[in-house]
Amino acid sequence: LTVHTDKPIVITGSMRPAGAISADGPINLLQAIQVARTPASVGKGVLVVLNGYVDGARDVSKRNTTNVATFDSPLVGHLGIVQDGVAHYYKASTRRHTKGSIFDVHDFKELPRVVILTCYGGMDDMVPMSVVATNPDGLILTGLGHGTIPQNVRQITQNTVFPTVRASRTGSGMVSAVPQDALAGYLVSDTLSPQKARILLMLGLTKTKNLKKLQQFFYEY
């Protein structure tokens, strides 16, 4: 979101220690280099390469604590595969990124403070009241299912002086606007996870505090 280039930016890693039987680090590093040098990788944005798959940074998530196939994009699928030393692509992100992004690290010295509040059944008022009392620059509400917020939490967090975004704890799917959001002053995360919604809101707040414009960022990025 803040690197304005069409050059491939590839992230890789390993799930097994270097001394483990069938360590995955060396092959992941090799394939990451192969992806970076593939001409078709130009303009694809930030890529994550592990276990022979190529994923877009926007949609990828870690799905398992130890499995080498931990990284996946459950909603949109892998962008491609690495085969015979070359990245083969079958889709591309339609969202703005890298050269198409308006966010610039030179525009700010530090990012706004955005916190994440995770909701659950039977949640009492203490935690949400404590979070709101700290007056953050923004708030991400991790709701149940389609970003559903418990009624008592909604009463505490609605129409705050800072932007509040509804997201979901499910790990996949879209959180879309419902009529109650306008009454509560909520934004929605679209298909971003709570963690990624936090990053986008922090960057968005470096440009504007207008709720409509902030919401548009979630539809574009």
Per-segment meaning from a language model:
Residues 10-13, 47-51, 118, 142, ...:
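Short beta-strand segments
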Residues 7-18, 182-185:
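Glycine/charged-rich beta-loop-alpha catalytic/anionic-binding loops adjacent to active sites
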Residues 1-8, 34-38, 206:
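Alpha-helix C-terminal capping segments
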Residues 146-221:
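C-terminal non-catalytic interaction/assembly regions of soluble proteins
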Residues 1-11, 127-133, 158:
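N-terminal small/polar loop signature for handling phosphorylated ligands or for N-terminal nucleophile
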Residues 14-84:
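Internal gly/pro-rich beta-alpha loop/helix module
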Residues 4-8, 41-45, 51, 76, ...:
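Short coil/turn connectors at secondary-structure junctions
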Residues 56-146:
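Accessory alpha-helical/coil subdomains and C-terminal extensions
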